């Protein structure tokens, strides 16, 4: 479809088996969501400033029609990457956090030279937290709902932070590549540890239901 002459009208087009909708919203992201997501950006010192000063945003929806979930996600990231070249773009809001535009675009460009490259950190957030200062680390994801899958949690793991993240990344890719959520009670091996998947109320995200991965054997 041609680009609308009235910026208030959404732009709809199809590409790579997906329906794409881009809309302009002439106001800040509602509910201070950008400010909250800026807190998840320890690697970008300017995130809070970008969140607090933005005046409008572009909303993007990419719906798989004939594309697989992976193909659809790759298309979404490529379109977001192209939007970073628009004038006055200050941040990309994805995966429960904000990205510096050039960094997001740089990650997306890795897909130009590989049909299998999938910069998962641009579309799924992998976080770590503790109940108390001396408690074991727990891990969680945000963003798997776009793949019609519950987000993941690993609670109070004895493993190192890098291992916990690797386990969650592996579990996320299992769901994304097969296009289906882990089944309640399913057993799988991640980074040499056998886990059981169980659907429960989230400990990290109030009100959410997530897939908890519980280690049953090393």
Where are these regions (language model features)?
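Hydrophobic, Leu/Ile/Phe/Ala-enriched alpha-helical segments that form helix-helix packing faces
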Residues: 1, 79-87, 168-177
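Long, low-complexity, Ser/Thr/Gly/Pro-rich intrinsically disordered segments that act as flexible linkers
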Residues: 1-34, 49-53, 179-205
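Internal, hydrophobic cores of structured domains that mediate oligomerization or house catalytic pockets
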Residues: 20-123
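Aromatic/basic-lined ligand-recognition segments
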Residues: 97-218
């Amino acid at each position: 479809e041609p680009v609308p002459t009235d910026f208030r009208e959404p732009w709809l087009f199809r590409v790579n088996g997906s329906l794409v909708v881009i809309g302009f919203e002439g106001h800040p992201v509602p509910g201070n969501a950008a400010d909250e997501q800026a807190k998840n950006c320890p690697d970008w010192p300017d995130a809070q400033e970008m969140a607090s000063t933005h005046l409008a945003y572009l909303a993007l929806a990419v719906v798989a029609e004939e594309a697989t979930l992976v193909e659809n996600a790759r298309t979404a990231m490529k379109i977001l990457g192209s939007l970073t070249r628009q004038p006055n773009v200050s941040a990309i809001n994805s995966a429960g956090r904000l990205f510096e535009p050039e960094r997001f675009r740089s990650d997306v460009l890795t897909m130009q030279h590989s049909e299998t490259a999938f910069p998962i950190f641009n579309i799924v957030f992998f976080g770590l937290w503790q109940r108390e200062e001396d408690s074991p680390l727990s891990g969680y994801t945000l963003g798997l709902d776009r793949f019609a899958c519950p987000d993941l949690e690993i609670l109070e793991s004895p493993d190192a932070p890098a291992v916990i993240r690797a386990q969650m990344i592996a579990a996320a890719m299992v769901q994304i590549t097969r296009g289906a959520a882990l089944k309640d009670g399913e057993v799988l091996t991640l980074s040499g540890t056998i886990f059981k998947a169980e659907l429960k109320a989230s400990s990290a995200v109030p009100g959410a239901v997530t897939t908890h991965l519980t280690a049953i054997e090393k």
